């Protein structure tokens, strides 16, 4: 009887894991929307095949972002940074963490947060939970966790935040994006080292991407250009 019960638990766990993976794959490959931007590493990857993937869709006041990573073990953070240029100084950082022992899956506000990067040194604003508790969202990004999924070595996070603070800070709506990964240490972000990449520019204003002809070839080209819009190396 115990063996049957144990096998049933294993089956349910496997089904849950597969459903989570399928959900992430659906989200991350939904890049045909004229307003949605997607990038991934390595070049040519799609969805959960990527080592690192990011998407953004904006309505002009808020943007919804997705961050996905493979080979993500315990005590790891994934992040994207918004910057006015490729130097990646004076930029906003939105991060998502995997801390199996230090976080509670029932409290999603522990899983993500904000930091501010000066000259390549992160100043922690805090997790969403701490920001709300301490009322220290000084830039008014109003970050919110929408979905959080983790598997044996994968991490998927969907978040939303206001875009006005970023646009006002840089005085532009089109900003450079950095994707990075590092070790979560003592409640903070360790330096990412070489595990980073400048992936291009996104428009936070919510304006449509350049429209192509309404054809199967055009649609496939749009997916290809959206997913592979990046240029350099990222080491994992």
From Swiss-Prot:
Signal sequence, renumbered to the chain: 1-24
GO cellular component: extracellular region
Residues bearing attached sugar chains per UniProt: 59, 171, 197
Subcellular localization, as worded in the UniProt entry: Secreted
UniProtKB keywords: Glycoprotein, Secreted, Signal
Keyword Ubl conjugation: no
Coarse class of the protein's main subcellular location: secreted
The protein's name in its UniProt record: Uncharacterized protein C44B7.5
Organism: Caenorhabditis elegans
């Amino acid at each position: 009887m115990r063996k049957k019960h144990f096998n049933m638990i294993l089956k349910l766990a496997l089904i849950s894991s597969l459903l989570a993976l399928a959900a992430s794959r659906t989200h991350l490959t939904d890049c045909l929307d004229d307003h949605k931007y997607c990038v991934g590493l390595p070049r040519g990857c799609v969805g959960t095949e990527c080592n690192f993937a990011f998407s953004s869709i904006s309505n002009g006041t808020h943007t919804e972002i997705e961050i996905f990573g493979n080979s993500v073990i315990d005590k790891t953070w994934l992040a994207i940074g918004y910057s006015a240029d490729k130097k990646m100084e004076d930029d906003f950082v939105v991060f998502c963490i995997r801390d199996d022992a230090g976080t509670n899956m029932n409290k999603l506000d522990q899983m993500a947060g904000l930091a501010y990067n000066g000259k390549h040194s992160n100043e922690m604003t805090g997790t969403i939970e701490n920001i709300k508790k301490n009322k220290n969202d000084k830039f008014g990004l109003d970050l919110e966790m929408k979905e959080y999924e983790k598997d044996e070595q994968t991490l998927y996070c969907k978040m939303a935040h206001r875009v006005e603070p970023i646009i006002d800070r840089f005085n532009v709506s089109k900003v450079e994006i950095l994707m990075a990964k590092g070790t979560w240490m003592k409640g903070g972000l360790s330096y990412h080292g070489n595990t980073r990449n400048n992936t291009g520019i996104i428009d936070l204003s919510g304006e449509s991407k350049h429209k192509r002809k309404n054809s199967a070839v055009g649609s496939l080209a749009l997916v290809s250009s959206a997913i592979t819009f990046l240029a350099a190396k990222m080491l994992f």
